[in-house]
């Protein structure tokens, strides 16, 4: 069975953006919502999923997560907008 890997961007209640990686998107989002996800997202829910990109390779997904995390906010918003247009 091929495992899928995802990079995602969430908008938090305080309008901040959180970028993450997972191999089980539904479960990870549930973890964020219940306060058991990343330390950054605790107390910042509810969340809106703004961006999801699927990978078949964990290494590529993690590289993309790192790349996105290095971007300034306006570049992340452009990335989200571009995906919405596809």
Swiss-Prot record:
Residue span, GIY-YIG domain: 3-80
Gene3D superfamilies: GIY-YIG endonuclease
Database matches in SUPFAM superfamilies: GIY-YIG endonuclease (SSF82771)
Alphabetized InterPro entries for the sequence: GIY-YIG_endonuc, GIY-YIG_endonuc_sf, UPF0213_domain
Family statement: Belongs to the UPF0213 family.
Name of the protein this chain belongs to: UPF0213 protein OB0043
């Amino acid at each position: 069975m091929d495992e899928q890997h995802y990079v995602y961007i969430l908008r938090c209640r305080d309008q901040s953006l959180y970028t993450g990686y997972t191999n089980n998107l539904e479960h990870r989002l549930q973890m964020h919502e219940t306060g058991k996800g990343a330390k950054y997202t605790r107390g910042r829910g509810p969340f809106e999923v703004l961006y999801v990109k699927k990978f078949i390779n964990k290494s590529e997904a993690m590289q993309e997560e790192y790349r996105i995390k290095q971007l300034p906010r306006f570049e992340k918003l452009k990335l989200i907008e571009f995906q919405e247009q596809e």
